[in-house]
C-alpha cells in the first residue's frame, strides 16, 4: 500500500511538472526576452527525471522484478529514456535541438501512461513464468531505449522535411507579425530568432535562406547521430531477445508479429544508415526514410500490444467499448 501511494504521488508530480515545463518552453520560444524561464524549465526536467526514477525504483522494490512487465510500466520507462536523451546535449554543452522533440514526446507518453485506459495495469503483478528471466531487463530495456532514441531521430528528420519544404517566409517584412500566427512549429521560431540575432552580430553578406540551411544541416546531423545510437541499441535488443526466445521457447526466431515488425523496423533504419553513405541521399531523401521509420516503430511497439496477439502479448490491453 505504501509503495502504491508513493508511485501514485510520483507519477502525478512528474506529469504536472512536465506540463509546466512544456508551457514554459513554448513561452520562451515565443518571447525570447524571457530567457530566465529556460533555466526554470531545465530544472523542472531534472526534477521530473528524479520523480520517474523514484517511481521505477519503488516499483522494482514492491514487485521484486524490473518494472517492464506490461504496457503501463514500459511507457513510464520510455518517458524515462526520453529524459535521458534530453540530458545528453546538456552534458556535451551543445545546442539542445533535442529538447524540441523530447519535451512534447515525454508529456504525451507519460500522459497516456497515467490515463484511465491503463488503470488496470497500475498495480504490479507477479510475472508469468515465461517472463521470469534475467533477460527481461536486458532485452526489454534495450528495446525501449532504442524506441525512444529512434523516435527522437525520426522526429528530427520529420522536422527537417517540414522546414525544407515550407515556403520561404520573409521574416523582415511588415507582415512579420503574422508569421507566428501561421505556424507553431518550434524550430521555425528558433530559426527566426537565430537569424535576427545573427544580423545584429555579423557583418558579412547573407545569401538567401542561409540560416534555414544551417538549421537543416544541424537537424540532419543530430538525426543521423541519434538514429545511429538507436539502431545500435535495437540490434543489441533483438539479439538479446533471440537468446531469450531460445531459452524460453526453444527457437531463436519464430516470426511472431512482434518479431516480424522488429525486423521491419531494423531493416528500415538499416536502409536509412546505408543511404547516408551516398552523398546524394544525405539530407532530404534519407529523412524520408527515417520519417517512415517513425510510423513503423509505433506499429511495432504500440500496435502489437493493442492487438494482443502472438507470443509477445503479455501486458497488452484492449480499448474500452
From Swiss-Prot:
Required during biogenesis of c-type cytochromes (cytochrome c6 and cytochrome f) at the step of heme attachment. Pfam families: Cytochrom_C_asm. It is a multi-pass membrane protein. One of its GO terms (biological process) is cytochrome complex assembly. Belongs to the CcmF/CycK/Ccl1/NrfE/CcsA family. Keywords: Chloroplast, Cytochrome c-type biogenesis, Membrane, Plastid, Thylakoid, Transmembrane, Transmembrane helix. One of its GO terms (cellular component) is plastid. It comes from the Eukaryota. The chain crosses the membrane at residues 9-29, 44-64, 68-88, 143-163, 226-246, 260-274, 289-309. It is found in: Plastid, Chloroplast thylakoid membrane. One of its GO terms (molecular function) is heme binding. This is Cytochrome c biogenesis protein CcsA. May interact with Ccs1. The keyword Transmembrane helix applies.
Amino acid at each position: 500500500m505504501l509503495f502504491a501511494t508513493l508511485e501514485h504521488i510520483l507519477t502525478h508530480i512528474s506529469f504536472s511538472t512536465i506540463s509546466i515545463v512544456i508551457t514554459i518552453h513554448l513561452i520562451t520560444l515565443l518571447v525570447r526576452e524571457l530567457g530566465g524561464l529556460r533555466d526554470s524549465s531545465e530544472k523542472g526536467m531534472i526534477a521530473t527525471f528524479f520523480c520517474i526514477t523514484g517511481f521505477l525504483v519503488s516499483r522494482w522494490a514492491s514487485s521484486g522484478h524490473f518494472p517492464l512487465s506490461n504496457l503501463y510500466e514500459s511507457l513510464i520507462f520510455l518517458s524515462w529514456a526520453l529524459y535521458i536523451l534530453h540530458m545528453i546535449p546538456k552534458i556535451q554543452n551543445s545546442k539542445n535541438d533535442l529538447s524540441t522533440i523530447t519535451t512534447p514526446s515525454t508529456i504525451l507518453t507519460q500522459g497516456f501512461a497515467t490515463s484511465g485506459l491503463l488503470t488496470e495495469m497500475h498495480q504490479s503483478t507477479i510475472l508469468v513464468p515465461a517472463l521470469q528471466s534475467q533477460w527481461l531487463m536486458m532485452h526489454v530495456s534495450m528495446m525501449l531505449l532504442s524506441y525512444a532514441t529512434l523516435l527522437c531521430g525520426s522526429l528530427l528528420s520529420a522536422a527537417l522535411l517540414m522546414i525544407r519544404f515550407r515556403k520561404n517566409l520573409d521574416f523582415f517584412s511588415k507582415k512579420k507579425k503574422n508569421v507566428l500566427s501561421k505556424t507553431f512549429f518550434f524550430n521555425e521560431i528558433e530559426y527566426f530568432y537565430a537569424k535576427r540575432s545573427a544580423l545584429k552580430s555579423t557583418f558579412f553578406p547573407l545569401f538567401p535562406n542561409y540560416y534555414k540551411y544551417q538549421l537543416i544541416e544541424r537537424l540532419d546531423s543530430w538525426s543521423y547521430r541519434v538514429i545511429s545510437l538507436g539502431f545500435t541499441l535495437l540490434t543489441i535488443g533483438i539479439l538479446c531477445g533471440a537468446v531469450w526466445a531460445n531459452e524460453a521457447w526453444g527457437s531463436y526466431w519464430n516470426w511472431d508479429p512482434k518479431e516480424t515488425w522488429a525486423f521491419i523496423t531494423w531493416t528500415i533504419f538499416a536502409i536509412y544508415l546505408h543511404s547516408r553513405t551516398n552523398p546524394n541521399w544525405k539530407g532530404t531523401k534519407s529523412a524520408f526514410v527515417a520519417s517512415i521509420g517513425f510510423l513503423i516503430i509505433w506499429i511495432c511497439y504500440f500496435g502489437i500490444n493493442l492487438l494482443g496477439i502472438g507470443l509477445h502479448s503479455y501486458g497488452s490491453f484492449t480499448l474500452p467499448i
